[in-house]
Swiss-Prot record:
The gene is gabD1. It comes from the Bacteria. It catalyses: succinate semialdehyde + NADP(+) + H2O = succinate + NADPH + 2 H(+). This is Succinate-semialdehyde dehydrogenase [NADP(+)]. NADP(+) binds at W133, N134, K157, H158, A159, S160, G209, S210, L232, E362. Its EC number is 1.2.1.79. InterPro entries: Ald_DH/histidinol_DH, Ald_DH_C, Ald_DH_CS_CYS, Ald_DH_N, Aldehyde_DH_dom, ALDH_GabD1-like, GABD/Sad-like. It is an enzyme of class 1 (oxidoreductase). The active site is at E231 (proton acceptor), C265 (nucleophile). It comes from Mycobacterium leprae (strain TN). The keyword Membrane does not apply. It holds the Pfam family Aldedh. PROSITE patterns: ALDEHYDE_DEHYDR_CYS (PS00070). GO terms for molecular function: aldehyde dehydrogenase [NAD(P)+] activity; succinate-semialdehyde dehydrogenase (NAD+) activity; succinate-semialdehyde dehydrogenase (NADP+) activity. Catalyzes the NADP(+)-dependent oxidation of succinate semialdehyde to succinate. It is believed to be the main source of succinate semialdehyde dehydrogenase activity in Mycobacterium.
Length: 457
């Protein structure tokens, strides 16, 4: 795959980039490994100063970085600005909390025959980050901020269609004051990942991306006995019960499905409405989806921009067309507009049966599948009928139902009466084929630490 900026709103190639050579990759690994030897001994106070300075730059340059994101992968300018500001928040969170989150944990010394016993968190070393295009800054920052604050150093292999975002990340972290070579961007294809991950100087890896990419990286890391965090796909359920505030649920359902032009791993994708309110939910949901404006992502009036890649749109088209051919009903959308760029309209599909691929598959675009549940257990059965287990939403005012959803939905996250969102303060990740490990919060910063037992007689 070429490394290039291709404007998804027009399909035009804006700029191409020379890939990082094998010699340059070797040099980057060597420099990262050498840097870790002294960077690990910097203090939390020093790292916090650099992290806060990086946050200042991210805030000050939000308009510029937003323009890069919109140009390279098509998200609306406002959502791109929001992403840049969220990155600043992530750096500030770990600047403030890292020392506390990684403080020594005393154990009961007498119980283990010691005068002193504790668990200590120490950085692992060079961590390879393989990151996707859909949140080109935030996906990387939610690795970089905790990893750097823990004393690790990073090598970034970003998606090949967001090279300018990838280069900006390394640049802004360097300008924030982090020592040279603490965080480096490598412009390489997926084929170059294996050699880096097998290098003994690389201690661990984190990947956000597709299931096949996660399988490949997980297999290599397993062979090398190296820790990994995998955040893969999702086909999140959004359940609406009779006691829900229906208008609020519908409004959130629309936002949850079309955020980031429908290209979010934690977007609500499968909407499950109780039979008592199913018809009303579908009517209101379709009506709101039909009002959304598809267009130029730089236009402030645009609700939904283009999909990021031509192949991505082709995949969405194939999934929708296959469902329709099998008997599913397209309530709105379903046909690409006749215009340049990789646009696809907000689409709602009903009457999906278990034998259709759409019943379990993830659709990475603004396409909503709607199902009717006869009761709460039926809703949970539909929700869990997927190989994925990333996020989930349930809308009900009934506290017993809320507890039932929390206990029985098989996912890494359950949001009640709200939209699934990643926060620096909360652990983020999934189970089943959505991956393993956690990003963000206490759990995220400890993923790439050696938990060292200390025992003193």
């Amino acid at each position: 795959m070429s490394i290039a900026t291709i404007n998804p709103a027009t399909g035009e190639t804006v700029k191409t980039f020379t890939p990082t050579t094998q010699d340059e990759v070797e040099d980057a690994i060597a420099r990262a490994y050498a840097r870790f030897d002294n960077y690990r001994h910097t203090t939390f106070t020093q790292r916090a100063k650099w992290a806060n300075a990086t946050a200042d730059l991210l805030e000050a340059e939000a308009n510029q970085s937003a323009a890069l994101m919109t140009l390279e992968m098509g998200k609306t300018l406002q959502s791109a600005k929001d992403e840049a500001m969220k990155c600043a928040k992530g750096f500030r969170y770990y600047a403030e909390k890292a020392e506390t989150l990684l403080a020594d944990e005393p154990a009961e010394a007498a119980a283990v025959g010691a005068s002193k016993a504790l668990a200590r968190y120490q950085p692992l070393g060079v961590v390879l980050a393989v990151m996707p295009w859909n949140f080109p800054l935030w996906q990387t920052v939610r690795f970089a901020a905790p990893a750097l604050m823990a004393g690790n150093v990073g090598l970034l292999k970003h998606a090949s269609n967001v090279p300018q975002c990838a280069l900006y990340l390394a640049d802004v972290i360097a300008r924030g004051g982090f020592p040279e070579d603490c965080f480096q961007t490598l412009l390489i294809s997926a084929n170059g990942v294996e050699a880096i991950l097998r290098d003994p100087r690389v201690a661990a890896a984190t990947l956000t991306g597709s299931e096949p990419a996660g399988q490949a990286v997980g297999a290599i890391a397993g062979n090398e006995i190296k820790p990994t965090v995998l955040e893969l796909g999702g086909s999140d359920p959004f359940i609406v019960m009779p006691s829900a505030d229906l208008d609020a649920a519908v409004a959130t359902a629309v936002t949850g499905r079309v955020q980031n032009n429908g290209q979010s791993c934690i977007a609500a994708k499968r909407f499950i409405a109780h039979a008592d309110i199913y018809d009303e939910f579908v009517e209101k949901f379709v009506a709101r989806m039909e009002t959304l404006r598809v267009g130029d992502p730089t236009d402030p009036d645009t609700d939904v921009g283009p999909l990021a890649t031509e192949s991505g749109r082709a995949q969405v088209e194939q999934q929708v067309d296959a469902a329709a051919a099998a008997g599913a009903v397209i309530r709105c959308g379903g046909k690409r507009p006749d215009r340049p760029g990789w646009f696809y309209p907000p689409t709602v599909i009903t009457d999906i049966t278990k034998d259709m691929a759409l019943y379990t598959d993830e659709v990475f675009g603004p396409v909503a599948s709607v199902y009717c549940a006869t009761n709460i257990d039926d809703a949970i059965e539909i929700a869990n009928a997927t190989p994925f287990g990333l996020g989930s939403n349930a809308w009900t005012q009934n506290e017993s139902e809320q507890r039932h959803f929390i206990d029985n939905i098989v996912a890494g996250q359950v949001f009640i009466n709200g939209m699934t969102v990643s926060y620096p303060e909360l652990p983020f990740g999934g189970i089943k084929r959505s991956g393993y490990g956690r990003e963000l919060s206490t759990h995220g910063i400890r993923e790439f630490c050696n938990i060292k037992t200390v025992w003193i007689a």
